[in-house]
Amino acid sequence: GLGDIFEAFFGGGAGARQPRSRVQPGNDALLRTTITLEEAFSGTKQDVTVDTAVLCEKCHGTGSQSESKPVTCGTCQGSGQIQETQQSFLGNVMTTRECPTCRGYGEVIQDPCPQCAGDGRVRATRDLTVNIPAGINSGMRIRMADQGEVGHGGGPAGDLYVEVQVEPHPVFVRENNDLHLRLNVPMYDAALGTELAVDNLAGGETIIEVPGGTQPGDTIHLPGEGMPRLRAEGAGDMIAHVQVAVPTALSNDERAALEDLRAGCPDDARV
């Protein structure tokens, strides 16, 4: 290319790159897992299986069957590059490319390990335990240091990131650290006031006080009864959205009682 042409004409060859190190750091790995809202509330531990490159146990990352040191590449004389002459519109020009024998390392392994073919690493599955903290939300990632891919030549491993997804819940809808729910309140209880129990995420019950005169669409806030704050003190709120349940079938006595109640209401209360 033009870069090679200018390099050849203007002395760029003197600044040619050094052969790359055979030992390279490994890449990070990503794993996705799913938990329930109850597990996100309390925190949990989850066993996962990961498939990554690990250190070759046969050669211990050297890539050599005898664990001998690599020797200087005879093709590029250890530079990791070879020069070639190519025809161009300017005539013959010298270009530089990666040595195909040593793949740019400047050295070769004379007796490659049969297990890893000289790479110093092999693919393997591993079982790990992930500690998932209370308060975690969908899309958040947990970093497990040095549990990712081992690098070429037995280089240091990258990190493993576990991305968490929280399943939808049949009762609660999460918004940040708040928990929303629909609370069905019988018409009589909405008028007179009552206490209702709902199952919470901790496995117990939360008592919700419904004041007399509660209207459809009203919200009742319970401070500190929501999701715990991730790695912090306190929790969000539980917010109950009231739906007043109007009976569809009435006994004669119930109908008579409601008619008496309606008859005693002032006119402005019926608007």
Language model features with spans:
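Residues immediately within or flanking Cys/His clusters that coordinate Zn2+
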Residues: A53-C56, T62, P70-C73, T96-C99, ...
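Short Cys/His-rich "knuckle" micro-motifs
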Residues: S66-P70, Q83-Q87, I109-P112, R123-D127
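Long amphipathic alpha-helical segments used for membrane anchoring, targeting, substrate engagement
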Residues: G1-Q24, E67-T72, C76-E98
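Residue-level signature of catalytic and energy-coupling elements of molecular machines
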Residues: I5-F6, I35, C59, C76, ...
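Short aromatic-acidic-glycine turn motif
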Residues: C56-K58, F172-V173
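Charged, often glycine-enriched C-terminal and inter-domain segments
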Residues: R22-K45, E107-V271
